[in-house]
């Protein structure tokens, strides 16, 4: 959305092994529908420019391939490619939006600064909070990737950085903003009310799955 204030969906998760993933997510086969809503994920990060550079290396570009019917000749289908963003978390996993992967034939993921694409699989999935976890079975992919830690929630007036892949671009973008509003709003996929953050500042039109980073103690 090309508004000065862009809405960002908030999701809180724990990296603790005592909290099983299945408590938050459903199987990928339960819900499969696509949405044009560009959602975002909130986590905390570190304060210096060098720390933002480290965080940038954890952000990946996701390529989703699907088949869509021809409206004129519905017996024919066409393969479509979509791209979005995600980021590495603990356990060799990628966190992104559910609507990014909800109707895919196959997925590929590319690291920042690399031309190589790696096959990815959906490991956990839930439209209620519009989040999905991907797995990548490649030792090479996980080399030199420092996963991000999911931390607390930023407050109004605090600085955040939006990292992702804007539409029409193939390189990662970093945008600085200020949290200007926090309020519950309906998610476009489930119509469930959850907290949504508004950040002010100059923003690009981001692909889904981007990360917004609060500057705080390496999270």
Curated annotation (Swiss-Prot):
Keywords associated with the record: Chloroplast, Hydrolase, Plastid, Protease, Serine protease, Transit peptide
Top enzyme category: hydrolase
Annotated stretches, region: Serine protease: 61-216
Transit peptide feature, positions: 1-45
GO molecular function: serine-type peptidase activity
Active site: residue positions: 99, 130, 208
Gene Ontology cellular-component terms listed: chloroplast
Organism domain of life: Eukaryota
Pfam families for this protein: Trypsin_2
InterPro entries: Peptidase_S1_PA
Protein family membership: Belongs to the peptidase S1B family.
Function of the molecule: Putative serine protease.
Protein name from the UniProt record: Putative protease Do-like 6, chloroplastic
Naturally occurring in which organism (per UniProt): Arabidopsis thaliana (Mouse-ear cress)
Highest classification ranks of the organism: Eukaryota, Viridiplantae, Streptophyta, Embryophyta, Tracheophyta
Gene: DEGP6
């Amino acid at each position: 959305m090309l508004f000065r204030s862009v809405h960002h969906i908030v999701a809180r998760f724990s990296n603790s092994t005592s909290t099983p993933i299945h408590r938050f997510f459903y199987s990928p086969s339960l819900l499969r529908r696509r949405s044009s809503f560009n959602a975002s994920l909130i986590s905390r990060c570190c304060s210096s420019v060098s720390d933002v550079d480290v965080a940038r290396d954890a952000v990946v570009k996701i390529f989703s391939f699907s088949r869509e019917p021809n409206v004129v000749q519905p017996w024919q289908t066409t393969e479509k490619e979509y791209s979005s963003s995600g980021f590495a978390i603990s356990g060799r996993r990628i966190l992104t939006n559910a609507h990014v992967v909800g109707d895919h034939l196959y997925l590929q993921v590319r690291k920042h600064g690399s031309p190589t694409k790696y096959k990815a699989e959906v490991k956990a999935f839930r439209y209620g909070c519009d989040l999905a976890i991907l797995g990548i079975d490649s030792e090479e992919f996980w080399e030199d990737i420092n996963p991000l830690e999911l931390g607390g929630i930023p407050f109004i007036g605090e600085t955040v950085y939006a990292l992702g892949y804007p539409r029409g671009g193939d390189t990662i973008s970093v945008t600085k903003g200020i949290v200007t509003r926090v309020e519950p709003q309906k998610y476009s996929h489930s119509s469930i009310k959850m907290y949504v953050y508004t950040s002010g500042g100059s923003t690009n039109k981001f692909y889904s799955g981007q990360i917004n980073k609060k500057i705080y103690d390496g999270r």
